[in-house]
Amino acid sequence: MAEEISTQAPRILAIRGGAIGDFVLTLPALAALHRAFPGCHMEILGYKHIAELGLHGGPVAGSTYARAVRCIEYGALAAFFARAFDLDAELCRYFSSFDRVVSWLFDPDKVFETNLGRAGVKNFTPAYTPIDNGSHASLQLAAELAKISVPLDDPVAHLVLAESALESARAWLAERDGDVGTRPLIAIHPGSGSSRKNWPVGNWRSLGDRAAAAGARLLIIGGEADTASLDYLEKKLEPHTPLLARNLPLHLVAALLTRCVAYFGNDTGISHIAAAVGAKCTLLFGPSGPSVWAP
């Protein structure tokens, strides 16, 4: 029988590790919690540079997924993953301040769950599930919420950005692009978390050449793992004066993608962000299965 909880606006803590794509694929589950508990105070414990996306947008206009974000990479938190250790008093107060904790962390022996109980957490929902090749990942990531009577009405990830994030993109473009708005902006993200999933960088160069020849302005996006590809494309596409978005905060990347008429990328977290903000995407899937992992 599904567990029943109060429909009053509670304090909810969502705990989500994983990479960028994993986080975005969990947004439908977070949106379902917001729909089930309108006005709830949600916070996210996760990798801060990723989870902060939830501070800058939400499932609908004027909303955010999170009111606050806390970094999961915190030394005192390690005791919560071990047996019979003293627990940090401040973290105990933090966890026990929530009416419900929902965790997507792998916890096969329930050590973390047990320690949250020791910390004073009364309502805990273990939402982790290993993703198989059955249904779409967003459906699998939300499946455990049915046990607390939270249905997944919409499996699509939506990230409607706050005006402050959109303004940051306008300012970034204005500083770098004298003809901003006069040419269509096309985004290219040549990397991913695995070289096996990457389209050859020479093909990205050819795509950039063709897009520029058709009158588009190029926006090339990447992080530290994409340095070699970005350096190559910056050099080879230099005649087209591409805009380079290197190592930018994710909310700024998301906002820049809302300004693009098209986005091209591999199976990667940035591609999930592009789809979530409503960009028109062409995504290349190699060894991974799009029926499970595509936006």
Describe the residue ranges of each PLM region:
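Catalytic machinery of carbohydrate-active enzymes
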Residues: M1-P295
